[in-house]
From Swiss-Prot:
Binds 2 heme b groups non-covalently. It is a multi-pass membrane protein. It is found in: Mitochondrion inner membrane. SUPFAM superfamilies: a domain/subunit of cytochrome bc1 complex (Ubiquinol-cytochrome c reductase), Transmembrane di-heme cytochromes. GO terms for molecular function: metal ion binding; ubiquinol-cytochrome-c reductase activity. Belongs to the cytochrome b family. This is Cytochrome b. The keyword Thylakoid does not apply. The chain crosses the membrane at residues 29-49, 73-95, 108-128, 174-194, 220-240, 284-301, 311-336, 344-363. The gene is mt:Cyt-b. The keyword Phosphoprotein does not apply.
Length: 372
């Protein structure tokens, strides 16, 4: 009986879901994220069986996984490449929402932004676990930014570190938090899907007619199957062709507590906010701007459906969105360079442009919602 109830729930939740007939491949990113997340959970579980933390950290366990465990290199590359694919497709998923005005579905949009924050936190914690030179010093720099919080900042940093400096106890905490946040992601994915299915999916035209819908299976499930083939190909390419492309070479060095790397940088999907952070002379101001760089997406959800649908069809919105995407790419590239001329100037200018275009987009959105 329980199996029949579970089967009918899954069937109604996924297969018989009413779906607009004009969805294109831009709407397949959510399914791709679900597949990659499942692969990340399985590969992460296998890696946790062989990952250990000793007095020198987790660097030796990574060498053990890569050299002594049968197929360990394969699982490790699946997990390390999967997070880059996951964040890249998540950014495309957000871009699709900006293009087609999906932010008018406020509950779904807000749950997605919260999910983005949790995924970024989990990705950062996982980046620290190899305990290489770049992982350690990057973690030290990022966590030390919390000391900019008035009154409680220093105590918060020492609590996270487990002492007056980052060490093995910090790594133990990060491993636990990485595991917990992965489970939280699963919960918020379910919340995101429930909210999406409650209000219904948007479509490229922005029209809402319940009669112009098909069940998700078999037409759209077949389309998602083709998307899954693309995901498998991307995994194959990243694992067997360029597994080290997105990994920093300095992270293959064991930690030297007496010497920092000449240029500390995070993973590529954090480079745009890292560039904004280092372009701000104030530590507290940099932390605030770094958070606001993503949190400002929340304000796009404040408005009416009609105004948002009409706004995203205008030429001005498309020009602003294209400019915003270009600035985002430039910030990502500049964040990977050292702080020297002309990269520092380009980073400062594009950081200002990033928020300027954001404010213009918000004002344009408020104007449309006021008129319509």
């Amino acid at each position: 009986m329980f199996f029949n109830i579970f089967k009918s729930s899954i069937k109604g939740f996924l297969l018989n879901l009413p779906t607009p007939i004009n969805l294109n491949y831009w709407y397949g990113f959510g399914s791709m994220l679900g597949l990659i997340y499942s692969i990340q959970i399985i590969s992460g579980l296998i890696l946790s069986w062989f990952y250990f933390i000793d007095l020198s950290g987790g660097f030796k366990s990574l060498i053990l996984i890569m050299q002594d465990v049968w197929g360990g290199w394969f699982i490790r590359f699946i997990h390390s490449s999967g997070v880059s694919l996951f964040m890249f497709i998540m950014y495309l998923h957000i871009l699709r929402g900006l293009i087609y005005g999906s932010f008018c579905k406020v509950d779904v949009w807000y749950s997605g932004i919260l999910l983005l924050f949790i995924c970024m936190g989990s990705a950062f914690l996982g980046y620290v676990l190899p305990w290489g030179s770049m992982s350690y010093w990057g973690m030290t720099v990022v966590t030390n930014m919390l000391s900019a919080i008035p009154m409680v900042g220093v105590y918060l940093v020492e609590t996270i570190w487990g002492g007056s400096s980052a060490g093995v106890s910090t790594l133990v905490r990060f491993f636990s938090f990485h595991y917990l946040l992965s489970l939280f992601i699963m919960v918020f994915i379910l919340i995101h899907l429930i909210l999406l299915h409650e209000c219904g999916s948007s479509n490229p035209l922005g029209v809402y007619y319940s009669c112009e819908k098909f069940t998700f299976h078999p037409l759209f499930s077949l389309k998602d199957t083709l998307v899954f083939v693309l995901v498998v190909f991307l995994y194959w390419f990243c694992i067997f062709v360029c597994p080290y492309l997105l990994l920093d070479a300095i992270n293959f060095e064991e930690i030297n507590f007496m010497m920092t790397p000449s240029h500390i940088k995070p993973e590529w999907y954090f480079l745009f906010i890292y560039c904004i952070l280092r372009s701000t002379p104030s530590k507290l101001g940099g932390v605030i701007l770094m958070v606001m760089a993503i949190l400002m997406l929340v304000f796009l959800g404040i408005g009416k459906n009609l105004g948002s649908v009409l706004m995203v069809k205008t030429l001005y919105w498309k020009l602003m969105l294209s400019s915003f995407l270009l600035v985002f790419i430039i910030l990502t590239i500049m964040g990977g360079y050292t702080v020297e001329y002309p990269y520092d100037i380009l980073g400062n200018v594009n950081s200002v442009l990033y928020f300027f275009i954001y404010v213009i987009m918000l004002l344009y959105s408020f104007m449309f919602n006021f008129v319509y």
